[in-house]
UniProtKB/Swiss-Prot annotation:
It holds the Pfam family MSSS. The keyword RNA-binding applies. SMART domains: MUTSac (SM00534), MUTSd (SM00533), SMR (SM00463). It comes from Streptococcus pneumoniae (strain Hungary19A-6). The keyword RNA-binding applies. InterPro entries: DNA_mismatch_repair_MutS_C (IPR000432), DNA_mismatch_repair_MutS_core (IPR007696), DNA_mismatch_repair_MutS_sf (IPR036187), MSSS (IPR046893), MutS (IPR045076), MutS2 (IPR005747), P-loop_NTPase (IPR027417), Smr_dom (IPR002625). This is Endonuclease MutS2. ATP binds at G328, P329, N330, T331, G332, G333, K334, T335. Signal peptide: none annotated. Belongs to the DNA mismatch repair MutS family. MutS2 subfamily.
Amino acid sequence: MNKKILETLEFDKVKALFEPHLLTEQGLEQLRQLAPTAKADKIKQAFAEMKEMQALFVEQPHFTILSTKEIAGVCKRLEMGADLNIEEFLLLKRVLLTSRELQSFYANLENVSLEELAFWFEKLHDFPQLQGNLQAFNDAGFIENFASEELARIRRKIHDSESQVRDVLQDLLKQKAQMLTEGIVASRNGRQVLPVKNTYRNKIAGVVHDISASGNTVYIEPREVVKLSEEIASLRADERYEMLRILQEISERVRPHAAEIANDAWIIGHLDLIRAKVRFIQERQAVVPQLSENQEIQLLHVCHPLVKNAVANDVYFGQDLTAIVITGPNTGGKTIMLKTLGLTQVMAQSGLPILADKGSRVGIFEEIFADIGDEQSIEQSLSTFSSHMTNIVDILGKVNQHSLLLLDELGAGTDPQEGAALAMAILEDLRLRQIKTMATTHYPELKAYGIETAFVQNASMEFDTATLRPTYRFMQGVPGRSNAFEIAKRLGLSEVIVGDASQQIDQDNDVNRIIEQLEEQTLESRKRLDNIREVEQENLKMNRALKKLYNELNREKETELNKAREQAAEIVDMALSESDQILKNLHSKSQLKPHEIIEAKAKLKKLAPEKVDLSKNKVLQKAKKKRAPKVGDDIVVLSYGQRGTLTSQLKDGRWEAQVGLIKMTLEEKEFDLVQAQQEKAVKKKQVNVVKRTSGRGPQARLDLRGKRYEEAMNELDTFIDQALLNNMAQVDIIHGIGTGVIREGVTKYLQRNKHVKSFGYAPQNAGGSGATIVTFKG
């Protein structure tokens, strides 16, 4: 679409209205590049994206996106083979973090049906290893020690050397206090120095780095720390070299993924722009219009977005209607009406919401042309008429059936009769070519043209004769009329003069009376329509409230069911625990044999209600999923206190993690999720604890050393029964070697027990013949 119409309609100012709702530089750049299109599929896609985002906001009203900076230049530098600096890596790190947050948000999103937005969410990439690499850079722009082993080693040596320097200087401060002007360590040229009185400068050996302005103080680096300082300087150089090497290495690791990261950044910006459109809809009560396939326009309560307190109007541009001619005085908002129509079309064809009511419909035009305002050129010495006519001639040569044309004060600037004739001729040419046109004029001759000509409709702007002010209400189907006599009379002009004037144009009085009747009918119809709209709005509010209440009730119902299931499962667990305690008490007070106790326990289990299956419970699934680590999670390695990122899970259940440039293999207990740590720090959840009375937990080992034979055999009998009751597969019995009496007693007991599958001495490194390992039957 031609740029001139965008400038005429001030489209850039309209786009600026969306900027406060954007969170990313990528979204801002896409907004600035936004332009109208005539491709129906592109417009439909933009409309569908906004509607899906609206549905998303219903479920997630606080949906947001992390702010990101533009990285196109950074990715281009990578592709050209350049190495990045820390600031550039932090920009990439932010994009990867935002991408991961959006993926996580989408994975946990429920109760929303997405199609267009799903395409973008699923296009985002996952880079767990790169995220781990980039953990080497903290947000303050510092390379962490764990970025490489060499960097950690160098920094440890620097720290140790600096500590030595401090210790030496502190000792000298005490020893040479009388020789110093101040009891502090100063810094000159990056070196630690002592402020020595000039009279004692030869008493302290070292290097002079500075002298005070008065000459009374000499800043000396003592000889004892010179060597250490030189070592520190050398280590600092090594540190800089190692940091450069790390930057080069991580640049090489990121380089193959530069295009994918740039694509992710674009998607983040696109989602941000869609989000900003919906925030604009919420703020300004805008709507996503319907799209007409045949250039039919129906705008309900449409407003100009740049006019404060704009009056809302209806515009109907049916399929067969070719021209709307707005007649009447120059005041009243005719030009604003032209711009409102054009700007609304431009916004819709750019994929933006419009300021109108639901049910509004827009067409698709390949071009929109306009001749609005006085665009005469002083340099060309063109009159107002010549300027307008030059522009119109140019437009008439370019328009076709797929164009929308806006003409302001058509035929103005010349003789009224000739101007009116030219205006009618131009409108007739456009009508015959079936080009949709909205034109304004103050020539009364065009009223008759609008009434008598097919597919052309008159319109006007309402004027309140009581207040002598325009109301800016658009009256489609009603031609404009002059209010000169009413205004003159109200302003105090003699009724005789007004009457004489009206007699001179009796011929036009009939027309004015008809127009007046049409105005009254239009106003009455508008009042009825406004009442209908108020009822519709109330119904919509009621429907929204009922839907919200229904959803809340469903959520509460699901929550209560989940609580009930959990309580039922807890009751079952408590019942089984109590049954265990009962059986233990029975065993201690009776001569029941182990196998009889086991059979009794099995019967009790059959009597207990079936365990509640919570495997399909969404709430518990979501909580479990949230707690379980997954590829891409940020972690803290507990033994080192360093951050990293999980990159993969091994078959044995262990995890591989990237910690700076170091790859580590960790068990789940050796790390903590960063998110879990943050949750602990931010909020302490109140936990309801159910206290249960129970004995000690099952023991898998019995130590009989130092026991008498009878005491040992009684303990062995109780231990084996307890092990069987707790379904243990294997236990250890430590009897020692000694005289062998207890060992022999253990062997005989195990041989007699029918629940024992096998037993034998432990390996040499686990006690040898001083311990017996027992395996029970399944």
